[in-house]
Amino acid sequence: MPTISEFFGIMILMFFDDHAPPHFHARYGGDEIVIQINPIGVLRGKFPPRALSLVIEWAQKYQQNLMEEWTRAANNKKLHKIPPLD
């Protein structure tokens, strides 16, 4: 499961050939959450409120990139890094 971005201690990961709907995983400390890409929203898991708001902000900024990486992952192609939240 490649890490496609990391910021403020939050790791953003995407699995190869993962189930629909298009989504990514985020880890922070001992917490993990799964975020749908379009529309952006929590599929499952729990995150501290501040960390969740940062992940949502990042996902909104890079939604197109996330969909491109989801397509690459679904086709077992090498994933590209997405810039962190600044």
Where are the regions a protein language model picked out?
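Basic nucleic-acid-binding interfaces
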Residues: M1-D86
